[in-house]
Amino acid sequence: MPTQEMIPSTLPRTQADSRPETWLDVLVIGAGPTGLACAIEAQNLGFKVMVVDKGCLVNSIYNYPANMVFFTTPELLEIGDIPFTTAHQKPTRLEALEYYRKVTERFQLHICQYHWVKTVTGEDGNFRVTATDRGGRIHDYQTRKIIVSTGYYDLPNLMGIPGEDLPKVFHYFREPHPYYDCDVVVIGGKNSAAEAALELWRHGARVTLVYRGAQLPSSLKYWVRPDIENRIKNFEIGAYFKSTVQEVGLDYVQIKTPESTVKLKNDFVFALTGYHPDYDFLRSIGIELSAEQCRPACDPETLESNVPGVYVAGVIVAGSRTSEIFIENGRFHGKQIAVDLRAKLKG
């Protein structure tokens, strides 16, 4: 079990010796739906709670494709027992953004957006958290407990190939218009890749899908599967299965297929190959990660990590198996943690 000395401290002495600007019972790192749910549950117990995020409120949802429709129904995205009403059976990205804004206002949650947590020092009951804002100003917070709910959408899974760092390569898809009349390669075969390929094709791009799998996965949204399959069948969207990208050039993409190597004319690439949690940040706090799947060591009942007083919540609990936890089940982590907070902070 890590001691105070085992948790790294990189604060300059003058900064570390200064008086924290805020004293808290609970600091939540990450303002996604799960982080908000954790803050609500802790605040409902009467604790002084603050949420910090290096981006905006529900930053991952904001970065979803502009016209994205959720696979789930609205009630499965609800937090804080606040109803989520939508115009149709499936909620849209815009509806979700509005809902989480309203929930934040309803509970008057203290959210510090665009605050990047740099260091966590101290011990259970007396942690020191240092963050920087957009202007580079340093903020110090002292808190009794910490909940880490940083998600995974910030860090794409890189392919490690030549040309991946070219400005024509993107790991997120927002909207199709800029790629009209362009040759576009979409790498991946899951929902994000299939939907991006369809959106691009509908808006006049010449699209080729490259996927390492033998066929499209069964997890595709039920309304997306027949659409993408028909576009491929009719040769409206090109597709290479059991194939990988070897190199990205200024005006081409080279792929390896089961039969040969193919060089495709190309203007833009969307490498939608998945994302992963910020393992380095978790390790910097002292949280141990499993060797194979990078799952954080934690009590499955309370979600307290191997660092006493530091809890993990949301998709980071699953490590690299990010498909195991969604908003639908991660939103309940706040209640699990709250039970332990009540026992330890009020007991």
Predicted stretch roles:
Residues 1, 8, 15-24, 28-54, ...:
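Rossmann-like dinucleotide/flavin-binding elements
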